[in-house]
């Protein structure tokens, strides 16, 4: 039995998710989306994770909707890079740090 639906992979917010979200909602399934935040999220979501990317920065409306942030840590400068671009403390939601998997053996990333 499905307990939650997570929409992720590529960039899900480039699609109009209204109909999908509606169909999931009438089945009482919670909906979680993970997005870079650069495109408007069309459709009602229960949880929004913003994982920002340099090539497509999050738009303000999505920063306000975020339930959490996921920052990919590629090297020792990654955290400072993103804190210079986004005021995570002011937004006030959890921020998770994830090592970039190709760098996961690099202790400076951990």
Task: State what each model feature region is.
Residues 1-7:
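Glycine/small-residue-rich loop that forms an oxyanion/phosphate-binding "nest" at active or ligand-binding sites
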Residues 4, 13-110:
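Conserved AdoMet/S-adenosylmethionine-binding subsite of the radical SAM
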């Amino acid at each position: 039995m499905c307990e939650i639906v997570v929409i992720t992979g590529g960039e899900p917010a480039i699609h109009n998710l209204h109909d999908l979200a509606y169909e999931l909602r009438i089945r009482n399934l919670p909906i979680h989306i993970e997005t870079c935040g650069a495109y408007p999220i069309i459709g009602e979501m229960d949880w929004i994770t913003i994982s920002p990317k340099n090539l497509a920065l999050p738009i303000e409306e999505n920063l306000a909707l975020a339930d959490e942030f996921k920052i990919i840590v590629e090297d020792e400068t990654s955290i400072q890079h993103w804190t210079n671009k986004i005021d995570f403390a002011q937004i006030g939601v959890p921020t998770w740090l994830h090592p970039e998997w190709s760098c996961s053996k690099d202790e400076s990333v951990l």
